[in-house]
């Protein structure tokens, strides 16, 4: 049975996938079979499994998701790891996650750095409701939330921050990928800012130095073909120690940069990433 089908059947039955394997020959009640086939039909039409089940695992956290938020992706776990390398444990740090969506990045950081104060923002009230619900269910009390567009969401007394993280919309308007597969069902505003896809990244990079402590870090996710441009934006904004990372598929996916000044935090060496011609 394909993985998606296993996940949907486990969801319908309220059991784990291991239970399914152990009971593979058990008869399926008619009402559960009908529910499964209804979900399977929606999946064949392209609807994401995470929307059908209402759940997605991310960095070891079981998150609620809905069509109000982007489905958290494995590639974004690389951004979280990059951020954690710049946030030493055991220190009372200040972090902001811009455009939090389901809260995946903010909650992953908060769970790994319990002494950090993490602020999660989003322009969407519906997305913030999902993120707040996840924080409550996971018992993460070191996360707060604010509504608004990028830095416009920050309360007057917020910051300066040790680290700014963001996985903003970065797909160009008219990109054919927006009409493919799962993306057709996800919120357009979370996927593309319009134009060449870089407007949100431009705003986030340009505004970061004023919100960061000296020696603080900005870490962003970007599109598969945007690494060089994003690194240029970092350099133009005055960042140093600019580092590009590849995701597990070898595709350039994350850029981090340090605000000049006396370092407030130390970075442990990142793991070596294989080169790729992709």
Predicted regions, residues:
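Conserved AdoMet
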Residues: 7-85
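Residue-level signal for inorganic ion chemistry
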Residues: 8, 46, 76, 105, ...
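Conserved beta-strand segments of alpha/beta enzyme cores
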Residues: 62, 117, 142-144, 240-243
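Conserved SAM/SAH cofactor-binding pocket of Class I
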Residues: 74-177
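Class I S-adenosylmethionine-dependent transferase superfamily signal
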Residues: 83, 109, 182, 204-208
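Mobile active-site "lid"/loop adjacent to the S-adenosyl-L-methionine
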Residues: 159, 169-200
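Conserved Class I SAM-dependent methyltransferase catalytic core
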Residues: 195-258
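C-terminal lobe and adjacent flexible extensions of AdoMet/dcAdoMet transferase-like proteins
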Residues: 254-278
């Amino acid at each position: 049975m394909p993985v998606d089908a296993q996940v949907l059947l486990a969801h319908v039955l309220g059991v784990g996938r291991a239970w399914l394997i152990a009971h593979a020959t058990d008869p399926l009640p008619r009402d559960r079979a009908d529910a499964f086939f209804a979900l399977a039909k929606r999946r064949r039409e392209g609807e994401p499994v995470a929307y059908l089940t209402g759940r997605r695992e991310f960095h070891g956290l079981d998150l609620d998701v809905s069509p109000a938020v982007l489905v958290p992706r494995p590639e974004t776990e690389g951004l979280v790891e990059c951020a954690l390398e710049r946030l030493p444990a055991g220190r009372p740090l200040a972090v902001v996650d811009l455009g939090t969506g389901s809260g995946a990045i903010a909650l992953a950081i908060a769970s790994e750095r319990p002494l950090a104060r993490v602020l999660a923002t989003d322009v969407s009230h519906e997305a913030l409701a999902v993120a707040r619900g996840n924080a409550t269910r996971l018992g993460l009390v070191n996360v707060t939330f604010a509504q608004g567009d990028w830095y416009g969401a920050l309360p007057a007394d917020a910051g300066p921050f040790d680290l700014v993280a963001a996985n903003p919309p970065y797909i160009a308007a008219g990109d054919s990928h927006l009409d493919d597969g799962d993306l057709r069902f996800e919120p357009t505003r979370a996927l593309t800012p319009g134009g060449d896809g870089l407007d949100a990244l431009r705003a986030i990079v340009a505004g970061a130095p004023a919100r960061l402590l000296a020696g603080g870090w900005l870490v962003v996710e970007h599109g598969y073909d945007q690494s060089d441009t994003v690194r240029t934006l970092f350099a133009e904004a005055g960042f140093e120690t600019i580092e590009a990372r590849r995701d597990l598929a070898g595709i350039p996916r994350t850029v981090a940069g340090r605000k000049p000044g006396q370092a407030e935090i130390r970075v442990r060496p990142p793991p070596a990433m294989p080169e790729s011609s992709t």
